[in-house]
Amino acid sequence: MWIPSKLTRPGRLHNAIVRPRVLELLQQAPYYKLVLFRSPAGYGKTTMAAQWLADKTNVGWYSIDDSDNDGFRFINYLLQALNKATNGNCNNAQKLAEKRQFSSLRSLFSDVFAEMVDFHQECYVVLDDYHVINNEEVHEAMRFFLKHMPDNLTLVVTSRANPPLGTANLRVRDLMIEIGNEMLAFDTEETTRFFNQRVADGIDEDTANNLRNYVEGWPSALQLIALQAQHQKRTLAQSAESVSQFNHAHLWDYLVEEVFDLLDADTRKFLMQVSVLDHFNDELVYALTQREDALGMIESLNRYGLFIYPLEGEQNWFRFHNLFGEFLSHERQARIPQQEQELNRNAAIAWLKQKSPHQAIRHAQKAYDGELVAEILNEFGWKMFNQGELSTLESAINLLEKDLLFSNPKLTMLRAWLAQSQHRYNQVGTLLAEAENEHKKRNIDLDIQYQGQANALLAQVAINSNDPEKALELAELALSQLDSTVYRSRIVATSVVGEVNHVIGRLDRALPMMQQTEKLARQYQVYHQALWAILQQSEILIAQGYVQAAFELQDSAFRLIEEQQLQHVPLHEFLLRVRAQVLWCWNRLDEAEECAYKGLQILENHAPSKHLHSYSMLARIAIGRGELDRAGKFIEHIQHLMKQSTYHVDWTANASLSLILYWQAKGKLNAIQEWLNTAVRPENACNHFCQLQWRNIARAHINLGQYDQARQALDFLQSEAEKANLVTDRNRNLIIEAIFAVHQKDENQAKVLLKEALQLTNQTGMVGNFLIDGATIGTLLEKLTNRHELGDLERHRALQLMKDISSNQRSRSVHFDEEFVEKLVTHPNVPELVRTSPLTQREWQVLGLIYSGFSNEQIAQELDVAGTTIKTHIRNLYQKLNIANRKEAVTTAENLLQLMGY
């Protein structure tokens, strides 16, 4: 007796979401022999096939179960499905099958194809859940069927495993469409539609994306999350926030029933053991399980659709689906808890054989094996340090028992270096002193090599603390103590000697020392030290006036970061910071802004105090664009950070420049005076950061009309810059001197200084420093070019500067800043409506941005406010200016700009 439901298409598709991206791929199905839906349980293979074929007329459906491994039973159901798909064109063959009147399945299929010769319509036969078939006779018959079936027939197979139907041959000949779990997994858009269809409150894109990523788009898991959210009356956002605490009981029950209990005991044990690894290859699995057939087992499980995925681009590396991995861990801890420590210990040893200490440490910690952790740190700690794996190292060292830590001087030295490398300089001396004391308690002698390493480290701390004399003394002492084999500390000591020479203005000595440091660091693969040396060279070259050479050297630093995967090391932010400063000086503000924001991303997990440089640059960029409101927000950040932390003069000088430029633009002379009252005045100015600080002081005095003090500061600046051959700083100082001359009403001297500055700019390319004072020097530049007082290169540079100054002024006007609005409303010819219905400053800004072509969304982003707030501002300004629409707003803004001479 045949069961009709086995030949019935699935119903209840009303709740399934439409999958256009999958359906689009299936449009070409009539031209293929086989359409294979292959994925693990719960990916919606059957639902997708049914949805796709719902509007097709000639479809036969066969739902397979375990009992269909009987050849007679299988062939009869298959022929009934085929007969249905062909409108009864296989009746004779079906009768032969029912009466067992055929010698072989091949001969029967030959009769079937002969009967179908007059049927030319497109048709489909579906074999649903083919993975339960393990009868080789059936497989062989289906291979014959696929090879010889007519072109108008397409076979559709759903299976958890790769069916033995000659799929490799079909794939090579492009006769098969394969829909795998990558296609069947929901993307974020489909996840959003799925939940919106099931949950009354709907779902936002971020929540949908979080949930989708957690379950890797697995539809069954998403369905269970939706049901649980409804049952517990929780929003999906709450479910997403606590997704790791999600009640997995129903999901685990599903996997036990649909997957795990169907496996033999040996395979279940294998999966539970391997699940201790996040990702794995056959060598790891062999070391863990001692199974000679490790690779065969992995490939077999992959073929059978057991949630094992090959890693893209990796040879014989695999991972479990996230949730299946969690499920296996749960089963492992429930069924074989006594093996947990041993498995993790074996996993640690296996990872060591793969030269992966990071993973080995993780498993050694899970095995609660402190001695193994210490062994790994001893052997691989410095290598991991050189590769930038600082947080992993620090957490491992912090978890060691005191006896394990202080029994090994190598580990205590590593601990101190970790503090230094993460800018905790004030802890280094304490850590070294504690280590020395603890080692003595344990009768451990600290040899001269240890002392040399400690001195090299303390030298680095001294230079970071702005004590170059002490740094040089310690670095030279370290070099006299250290053997050439202790290469890391020798590299650091050499670097410190170079940095000291940089700080004290001996650039001709500093550069070769840093080049030597880079060479040694690359030779011994101490890559973050090589990166540091490149950055120092870049700053030295900038100071010497070779800015283009510095820029190109920075490119090599970016390559090093990419090659050695140092993207998350704090020095990456330092590189972006120096690059942003060069780009700002070259007036490439968009690129400088991008660097500053990237720097903030890199430091997002570090203390907010480290963000000062990025905010200083962002404020300067906003000031340069005339976006004073935006700049004001960055200035607030800067002031807050400077109150909260103590900084090196390099940091405070950069931040102070942004503060002074902002106060200068806003006319806040009291703020400038307050800053000047407490400003640090370095004893010398033989390096770029002390030069910058003294330039800030000179600028402050000029703004306040304190010309005698300004003159003294400028004389000191240029004297120091000349002594240390700081070419780029001389260039910047000349511009400030020209500003001073303008304030002194000495136009001739101002022009002489500007001419000299332009000549130096041919080498340095520095234009940003001209532009920040464009309103003061613009007229002088015009006079210089008109009177042919400049050489060709200087004239070209001056014309470009005038163009940029004009563009910046127009930009500020379009942004309708306070100064522009004040001039506008007092203009004798301004329309009465503008005078009697004054707009707020924010409404003027919005009008300017509308004129610039910004959409509402872009305006909201530019001013960093909500879209609804922008709509309110637009409604208000339309009402006040009697404007009906955006077009009229643009016309009004244009008329006002023309009135002001723009």
UniProtKB/Swiss-Prot annotation:
It comes from the Bacteria. Residues 832-897 form the HTH luxR-type domain. One of its GO terms (biological process) is positive regulation of carbohydrate metabolic process. The keyword DNA-binding applies. Keywords: Activator, ATP-binding, Carbohydrate metabolism, DNA-binding, Nucleotide-binding, Transcription, Transcription regulation. ATP binds at residues 39-46. Pfam families: GerE, TPR_MalT. Coiled coil: none annotated. InterPro entries: P-loop_NTPase, Sig_transdc_resp-reg_C-effctor, TPR-like_helical_dom_sf, TPR_MalT, Tscrpt_reg_HTH_MalT, Tscrpt_reg_LuxR_C, WH-like_DNA-bd_sf. Residues 856-875 bind DNA. SUPFAM superfamilies: C-terminal effector domain of the bipartite response regulators, P-loop containing nucleoside triphosphate hydrolases, TPR-like. Activated by ATP and maltotriose, which are both required for DNA binding. GO terms for molecular function: ATP binding; DNA binding; DNA-binding transcription factor activity. Monomer in solution. Oligomerizes to an active state in the presence of the positive effectors ATP and maltotriose. Positively regulates the transcription of the maltose regulon whose gene products are responsible for uptake and catabolism of malto-oligosaccharides. Specifically binds to the promoter region of its target genes, recognizing a short DNA motif called the MalT box. Belongs to the MalT family. This is HTH-type transcriptional regulator MalT. The lineage of its organism: Bacteria, Pseudomonadati, Pseudomonadota, Gammaproteobacteria, Vibrionales.
